[in-house]
Structure formats: structure tokens, C-alpha cells
Design a protein with these regions (language model features):
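Conserved class I S-adenosyl-L-methionine
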Residues: 191-225, 232
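Conserved N-terminal segment of class I S-adenosyl-L-methionine
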Residues: 1-157, 162, 295-296, 302, ...
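Glycine-rich, histidine-containing beta strand-loop boundary motifs that form or position
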Residues: 125, 147, 167, 196-198
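N-terminal cap/leader regions of alpha/beta-hydrolase-fold enzymes
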Residues: 26, 166, 179-182
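A short glycine-rich, Lys/Arg-flanked "PGG" loop and its adjoining helix->strand segment in the class I
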Residues: 176-188
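Substrate-binding/catalytic lobe of Class I Rossmann-like enzymes that use SAM or dcSAM, i.e.
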Residues: 207, 219-308
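A short SAM/SAH-binding and catalytic strip from SAM-dependent methyltransferases
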Residues: 162-173
């Protein structure tokens, strides 16, 4: 994995080098350092700019447990490709030969698609999910990954053609600050692509809310085990009701069951996955829905207003996918401001 031109010491805004002086990070690399003496540990081939998963620990456990579940290359179904294509405006050509920052990369469902579409991808995640992403994507040309906090990301401001953050912002403490940070890494005339949960009928059911209150704050290991047991217990009912759904009485019973079951069920949306993968997706997304510490909701108008307040242009925001999907461009006028910040935002220690 090669060091990238965008990578820098987050404290001193200067280049980082591997301990052996080469431009490559390998499993033998112990740390990265800047010329002022900061050292960033490299563990299992991945630079670690944070020492813990913080509020994202459950996601780290989740993505390592379901490392390939949502990868199109594993499922053989273009669910992730369709979503990414739609969010990019209709074509993956938007990232070809572009530098792309992917924040909250998880296990790599979008990372692998960005790479296969010809992008140079700088992937990052706050959680240990980076290990699953590395397992799935390392070796691909143009791939770099690190574990880091968005608000202290080790890259120069205004240095990426495209910044992608999907399925993430709603899980951060302050979504508007998250969007502002994402915008800061977009080049002038570059593209920002985001999404966010919406208010609506898909909100948490009462039983899911109660279980979530019980699980949030517990150890990731306990929460994952609890959800796996819950899904194993209830999934046979989901399958049975789906199988006999053509009977009107069963269809009515199924609608009622789906309104009270804490298990997420994708039979109506992704039946092409087949029974085995539908079960895996149910376990994955039920865990995701019941263990996230933050679960914010926003309207299209709120997302659009946020982007406008940040000075973004060409804003397109609409309801779709997981909620609100939006993209916007940074105006060319921001080029000088980014340069000034990169030169002056220095501190004495990391």
C-alpha cells in the first residue's frame, strides 16, 4: 500500500514517511512519522491515527463479523453498485481517474466499487472496520486506508476530487459538523456525495426502540451475540410468513408481524439475494439498527440548507435509498482559503 500525496501529519500538516524510508506500507511497517518527530503506529498494515473505536466500537465489531455480507462481489447482486451509481448522479464514471476520499468506509461495499471504477481511493473509518476493509480491498491499485477520526483526518484540506460518505453521517454526534468537515476536504469544483436518515414511516418501532435502549452502551461482543440470538429465534417466522404470503390471511398476519418484530426483513426489497444472504443481511442490519449510539434524522430541506450554509453549489438533494441523498460542488472561489488553512493550521505537537 503506497503512501499518497494527500496524506499528512494531522498536527503539523506535513508529509509522513514510513519507518524504513520507503513509500510503501507493508505488514512489517511499524510506524509513520513526520520530520518534527510525530509517530503514528501501523498495526496489521494499517496506520492508526486513533487509539480506540470511541462511539463506533459496535460498528467495528459488526463489520468484522459481516466482512463480505454487503459486497456485490460476494453476493453477485448489484445492490451496492446501484446505490453508489444513483448517489453519484447516474454513472460511476464520475470517479474514474479521480482522487476519492471515502469516510466511514466500513467493510468496503463502496470501496471495492470505487476502486474497480478507476478511482484512487483514500478510505478511512473511526472503527476497527478498517481491518475488514483491508482484507477485502488491499492489493488493488490506488488503494490506501487508515483508522482515523474525521475531525483530525490525516489529509490536506481541499485535496480530493470527490468525497463520499454514505451510511455514516446519521451515526455521528453532530451531523452538521460532520458535513462541514467533509466539505473541507473537497477540492474547488470537486464533488461531495452524502446521505442521511430521514424522518418517516421507517422509523424505529417501539420494540426496536426498547431493545436499542437496552443494548446501547453494552460491550460490542454482548450486543452482537444478543442480536444474533434474536435473529436466529425469530427468523423462521419471517421465512414462513414470506413463503405463504400469497394467502390473504397470511399476508395480513405478515404485515402485523413486520410491524412488531425487531428483526429487519428484506424479502420485499432484495428477494434476489436468496434465503442464506437474506438471513445474513437481517442479522447485519438488525445489529446496525439496534446498537448505534447516535441515530439522527433530517429532511431534504435541512440537508440542502446545511450545504447552502457551507457555501456549496449545484446542490441536489432528494429522498431515496436510506433517506436523504445529496451531492454538491465546492465553488472555485475556495481555492485560496484552503491553501491558507493548510499552511497556517499548525500546532507544535500531534
Amino acid at each position: 500500500m503506497r503512501l499518497t500525496a494527500e496524506l499528512c501529519c494531522p498536527g503539523h500538516r506535513m508529509p509522513l514517511a514510513a519507518d524504513d524510508g520507503t513509500p510503501e506500507i507493508t505488514l512489517a511497517t511499524r510506524f509513520l512519522s513526520c520530520r518534527l518527530g510525530c509517530q503514528i503506529p501501523v498495526i496489521a498494515g494499517i496506520p492508526r491515527f486513533v487509539i480506540s473505536d470511541s462511539y463506533a466500537a459496535s460498528f467495528g465489531k459488526q463489520w468484522k463479523a459481516f466482512r463480505r455480507t454487503q459486497l456485490d462481489s460476494f453476493t453477485g447482486v448489484a445492490i451496492s453498485r446501484d446505490r453508489l451509481t444513483r448517489c453519484l448522479g447516474g454513472s460511476l464514471d464520475a470517479v474514474r481517474n479521480k482522487s476519492v476520499l471515502e469516510v466511514g468506509c466500513g467493510a468496503g461495499r463502496f470501496t471495492e466499487l470505487l476502486l474497480s471504477s478507476g478511482a484512487r481511493v483514500f478510505a478511512s473509518d473511526l472503527s476497527s472496520a478498517v481491518e475488514a476493509n483491508y482484507d477485502n480491498c488491499h492489493g488493488a491499485p490506488g488503494y490506501f486506508i487508515c483508522q482515523a477520526d474525521l475531525h483530525a483526518l490525516p489529509v490536506y484540506l481541499g485535496s480530493f476530487d470527490v468525497v463520499v460518505c454514505l451510511g455514516v453521517i446519521q451515526h455521528t454526534p453532530e451531523p452538521e459538523k460532520t458535513v462541514a468537515a467533509l466539505c473541507s476536504f473537497v477540492k474547488p469544483d470537486g464533488l461531495l456525495v452524502i446521505d442521511h436518515y430521514r424522518y418517516g414511516p421507517e422509523d424505529m418501532t417501539p420494540i426496536r426502540q426498547r431493545i436499542r435502549r437496552f443494548l446501547v452502551g453494552r460491550s460490542p461482543r454482548f450486543s452482537l451475540g444478543y442480536v444474533r440470538f434474536l435473529v436466529a429465534l425469530l427468523w423462521p417466522v419471517h421465512r414462513l410468513l414470506w413463503h405463504f404470503r400469497s394467502h390473504s390471511s397470511v399476508a395480513a398476519a405478515r404485515r402485523k408481524w413486520l410491524s412488531i418484530s425487531p428483526v429487519l426483513d428484506y424479502h420485499d426489497y432484495y428477494s434476489q439475494l436468496g434465503p442464506r444472504l437474506l438471513y445474513a443481511w437481517a442479522a447485519l442490519d438488525t445489529h446496525d439498527a439496534l446498537t448505534d449510539r447516535y441515530k439522527h434524522k433530517r429532511t431534504v430541506e435541512e440537508i440542502r440548507e446545511c450545504l447552502q450554509d457551507l457555501g456549496m453549489e449545484g446542490i441536489e438533494a432528494r429522498y431515496g435509498g436510506n433517506g436523504v441523498e445529496a451531492r454538491a460542488r465546492k465553488p472555485l472561489a475556495n481555492v485560496d482559503a484552503n491553501e491558507r488553512i493548510n499552511r497556517s493550521d499548525l500546532i507544535e505537537t500531534c
